[in-house]
């Protein structure tokens, strides 16, 4: 809801005309504008032009719960679904995992950057980084809700050009902090009896993937 093919919102929103391609080029780890990273698998400048054209703005305020409730209702019509999420959509994905019941058979989350949930009282401290977004934070939910994420396997996948230690590049350091929080999330799920894992594609020989 309020973005892309579900963009006809039922609440008001304002869309600002802002040229922000340089920012997203860096944030999506394609490279540092205007140069691609040397190992980038992104095809060409021509394809980049097409990529910018398919990006759509929010047409109303972003709301994890609204998104999660909508997808959860759709899942009730299925006989078993593996939920695939990406980027900001991974946050609602964890909430869907606590709401969807037995129809949800697994979650594959590609590059979550925010929206991680933890049991109340066990939320990690914010992770400082050099990005434009400030420290990477998580939120707490009741343990009874969090434990619902242990009913099915969870795989979190990250691409290339994410450093293991702090760097000055604000875009890369954002993802360093995000992937660190993902590791903490996986530990928390598994500590409650779950089956969660983080996969960094370069670690298995798959290189050059952007966000």
Spans of features found by a protein language model:
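Conserved alpha/beta-hydrolase fold motif
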Residues: 83-84, 107
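Gly/Ala-rich beta-loop-alpha elbow adjacent to hydrolase catalytic centers
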Residues: 84-93
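Active-site signature of alpha/beta-hydrolase-fold catalytic machinery across serine-
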Residues: 95-99
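The feature captures the conserved acid-bearing segment of alpha/beta-hydrolase catalytic domains
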Residues: 112-192, 197
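C-terminal catalytic histidine-bearing segment of alpha/beta-hydrolase fold enzymes
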Residues: 196-210
């Amino acid at each position: 809801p309020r973005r892309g093919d579900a963009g006809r919102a039922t609440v008001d929103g304002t869309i600002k005309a802002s040229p922000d391609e340089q920012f997203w080029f860096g944030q999506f780890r394609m490279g540092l504008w205007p140069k691609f990273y040397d190992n980038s698998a992104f095809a060409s400048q021509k394809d980049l032009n097409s990529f910018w054209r398919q990006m759509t703005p929010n047409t109303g305020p972003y709301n994890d719960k609204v998104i999660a409730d909508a997808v959860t209702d759709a899942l009730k019509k299925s006989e078993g679904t593996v939920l695939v999420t990406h980027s900001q959509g991974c946050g609602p994905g964890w909430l869907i995992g606590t709401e969807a019941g037995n129809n949800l058979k697994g979650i594959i989350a590609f590059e979550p950057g925010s929206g991680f949930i933890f049991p109340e009282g066990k939320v990690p401290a914010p992770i400082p980084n050099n990005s434009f977004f400030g420290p990477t934070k998580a939120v707490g939910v009741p343990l009874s809700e969090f434990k619902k994420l242990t009913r099915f396997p969870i795989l979190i996948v990250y691409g290339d050009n994410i450093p293991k230690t702090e760097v000055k590049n604000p875009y890369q350091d954002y993802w360093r902090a995000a992937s660190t929080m993902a590791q903490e999330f996986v530990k928390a799920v598994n500590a409650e009896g779950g089956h969660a894992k983080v996969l960094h594609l370069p670690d298995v020989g798959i290189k050059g993937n952007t966000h």
